[in-house]
Design a protein with these regions (language model features):
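N-terminal leader/targeting segments
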Residues: 1-107, 187, 207, 311
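C-terminal regulatory/interaction regions
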Residues: 2-16, 30-41, 45, 55-59, ...
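Aromatic-rich juxtamembrane segments at the membrane interface
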Residues: 13-52, 182-313, 320, 473
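Hydrophobic alpha-helical transmembrane segments in multi-pass membrane proteins
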Residues: 40, 48, 79-85, 189, ...
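Hydrophobic alpha-helical transmembrane segments in integral membrane proteins
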Residues: 93-115, 498-506
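Structural detector for short beta-strands of small beta-barrel domains
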Residues: 112-126
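OB-fold (S1/OB) nucleic-acid-binding surfaces
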Residues: 128-146
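Short nucleic-acid-contacting surface segments enriched for D/E, G, S/T with interspersed K/R
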Residues: 150-165
Length: 506
C-alpha cells in the first residue's frame, strides 16, 4: 500500500481471469466506513458545541438536546448499526459538555485587584500610540492596553516571559467582547504598576519556550537584514509574524487573495520537516517519532500556536504516529480525526475564522487534487506535468476556502486565481529555505548576512509586487462571481464518477 501525494490510499490488484482479460480491483480507502464515521463524529461534536454554548437556557438549545435524546433512544431500539449512532450521540454530548464548561469558565472568572506574576500569552502588539498585550493571570487570560513607559517596557518582552504587575481585573465591555471570549480572554487588566521579576523576566519561562523564543529571535535578526517592508513580509512568510506589516501591505494581500501566505500553515510545517528530514531518516523508529513530535511542538510554540498551526501540526503528528506504528492512513481520515480531537480539546475553535480557512484549504487539497488532476490530464496539460503540479494545488485550495471566504469576507476577487499561481511558488521557496538561511544570517557578520539574504529580498519583492498588481486590477463583481462559479463547476465536474472499461478489445 502506498500513500500518495494527497493522502488517499488506493490499492490496485490485477488478477488474471479467463482468456486475456484482466480485472483491476480498486480498494479506495478514502471511501471506507471509518472516513464517514470520523467525519460524522466531528460534525456531531460541532453540533454539540454549538448547542452547549447556551446550555439549557434557550428554547433552541433545549429543542436541540431533546432531538438528540429522542434520536438516541430511537437508534438504540431500532437501528442495526446502533453502536455507530450511539457513538455519534456520545460525541454530541461530549462536545456540548466541553463547550458549556469553557463558556462557564469565561463568564465566571474572578475579577478585582491583583498583585503578582503575569505571563505573556502573545507577543506585545503595537497599535497606534499604545501596545496591546494578552497575559495569563491566575490561569485566566486578560487583555491590557499600555502606553508610555509601560508600553516601552512591555515591548522588551515576548510571549512566555513573566512580569510583576499590580492592577485591577475588570470585565470586558466592548463590541469585541465575544471575539475576545472565543480566544479565552475573560476580561481586561488595568495595569497600574509593571516591573521585571527580580530573577529575570525568563525566570518562569519553560526551557522549551525559551528555546523557541531564541530561535524566533535569531530568525527576526536575519529578517531585519532585509530593508523596510521586505523584512516584515519575510517574517510573515517564514514564521507567521505579521506584527510589523503596515496596514497598506495587509490590505493589498487581502484584496489580491494572498493573505493566507502570511499565516503559518501546513506548507510551513512540511517545509520544516523537509529541512530536518535527513537527520530524522537516520534515526530508529521510536527516537524518530519522539524527535518529530518535539520539532512539531517547538514549531507550534515558535509560531505562537495559531489555529492554522494547531491544525497542521496535529495532522503531521498523527501521521508520524501512524507511520511509526507501521500502518498507513489517508489524509482525509487524519483531517477528520484532527477536527474531532481538537474540537474536544478547545471547543472555541468552532468560532475561529482562521481555523476554518485552514481546514477548508486542507480539505480542498485532499479531496480535489486528484480529481482535478485526472480531469486536466485529458487536456493538453497532460504533456506538461510541471504545469499540473503548479496549477492543481492552487485551484483545489482556493475551492476549499471559498465557502468560508464568501460567508465572512464576501466574494473573492477573480484576481486571486492568477495572483496565487504567480506568488505561491516563489513564496514556497522562501518558506523552504528561509528558516536555515535566516538563522545563519542572524549569527553571521553583517556583510555575509546581506549576501545570504539578498535572494530572499528578490523573492519577497516579487510576492509583494504580485499582491500590489492584484489590488490595482480589481475586476467588477460580476467577473468575480463568474470566476468563482467556473472554479466550483470545474471541481464538481472533476468529482463526478467516471466509468471506463479497460478490458474491451478493439
Amino acid at each position: 500500500m502506498k500513500l500518495n501525494s494527497v493522502g488517499n490510499d488506493v490499492r490496485i490488484r490485477t488478477q488474471t481471469q479467463s482468456g486475456t482479460h484482466k480485472v483491476q480491483e480498486y480498494d479506495a480507502q478514502g471511501a471506507s466506513a471509518w472516513h464517514y464515521f470520523l467525519g460524522l463524529a466531528a460534525g456531531a461534536t460541532l453540533l454539540g458545541i454549538w448547542l452547549g454554548e447556551k446550555g439549557f437556557t434557550s428554547w433552541s438549545a433545549r429543542g436541540g438536546w431533546l432531538m438528540i435524546a429522542v434520536a438516541g433512544v430511537g437508534i438504540i431500539l431500532l437501528s442495526r448499526i446502533r453502536w455507530v449512532l450511539v457513538l455519534l450521540c456520545v460525541c454530541a454530548v461530549v462536545g456540548g459538555m466541553r463547550s458549556h464548561s469553557e463558556w462557564n469558565a469565561v463568564h465566571s472568572a474572578e475579577m478585582g485587584p491583583f498583585t503578582g506574576r503575569a505571563v505573556l500569552v502573545t507577543d506585545p502588539e503595537p497599535v497606534g500610540t499604545g501596545v496591546r498585550i494578552v497575559s495569563e493571570i491566575s490561569g485566566k487570560r486578560f487583555e491590557s492596553w499600555l502606553y508610555g513607559s509601560k508600553a516601552k517596557r512591555a515591548m522588551q518582552h515576548v510571549a512566555g516571559e513573566s512580569l510583576a504587575v499590580i492592577g485591577q481585573r475588570e470585565p470586558t465591555r466592548s463590541r469585541y467582547q465575544r471575539r475576545l471570549e472565543v480566544r479565552h480572554i475573560v476580561g481586561r487588566f488595568e495595569v497600574s504598576t509593571m516591573s521585571d521579576i527580580e530573577q529575570g523576566a525568563q525566570a518562569f519561562e519553560s526551557r522549551f519556550m525559551l528555546a523557541a523564543n531564541r530561535v524566533r529571535s535569531a530568525l527576526s535578526d536575519g529578517a531585519q537584514i532585509l530593508s523596510g517592508d521586505q523584512g516584515a513580509l519575510f517574517s510573515g512568510l517564514v514564521y507567521g509574524d505579521d506584527s510589523q506589516q503596515p496596514d497598506s501591505m495587509v490590505a493589498r494581500f487581502r484584496s489580491s487573495g494572498l493573505a493566507h501566505l502570511t499565516a503559518v500553515s501546513g506548507q510551513n510545517v512540511a517545509f520544516i520537516l523537509a529541512v530536518v528530514a535527513r537527520v530524522l531518516t537516520r534515526l530508529k523508529r521510536s527516537p524518530r517519532l519522539v524527535v518529530t513530535l518535539l520539532i512539531l511542538a517547538w514549531f507550534a510554540i515558535m509560531t505562537r500556536v495559531e489555529p492554522s498551526v494547531v491544525r497542521a501540526v496535529t495532522m503531521a503528528g498523527i501521521s508520524a504516529i501512524v507511520f511509526a506504528a507501521g500502518r498507513t492512513s489517508s489524509a482525509s481520515k487524519i483531517l477528520a480525526a484532527t477536527m474531532l480531537g481538537l474540537f474536544v480539546i478547545d471547543p472555541f475553535l468552532v468560532w475561529s475564522v482562521g481555523w476554518w480557512l485552514s481546514v477548508g484549504g486542507s480539505g480542498g487539497l485532499i479531496l480535489l487534487s486528484q480529481p482535478l488532476k485526472r480531469s486536466l490530464e485529458s487536456t493538453r496539460m497532460a504533456h506538461h506535468p510541471w504545469l499540473m503540479v503548479w496549477i492543481v494545488p492552487s485551484l483545489a485550495a482556493q475551492v476549499g476556502v471559498l465557502p468560508v471566504s464568501v460567508m465572512i469576507f464576501g466574494w473573492p476577487s477573480a484576481m486571486s486565481i492568477p495572483c496565487n499561481l504567480l506568488a505561491v511558488p516563489v513564496a514556497g521557496i522562501v518558506m523552504l529555505l528561509g528558516v536555515p538561511v535566516a538563522l545563519a544570517a542572524g549569527f553571521a557578520p553583517v556583510s555575509v548576512a546581506h549576501v545570504l539574504m539578498w535572494p530572499f529580498g528578490i523573492g519577497v519583492r516579487w510576492v509583494d509586487t504580485v499582491a500590489a498588481i492584484g489590488e490595482r486590477l480589481q475586476p467588477p463583481m460580476w467577473i468575480n462571481l463568474v470566476a468563482s462559479s467556473i472554479l466550483v463547476g470545474l471541481s464538481l465536474w472533476a468529482m463526478l464518477p467516471r466509468h471506463r472499461c479497460d478490458n474491451l478489445e478493439m
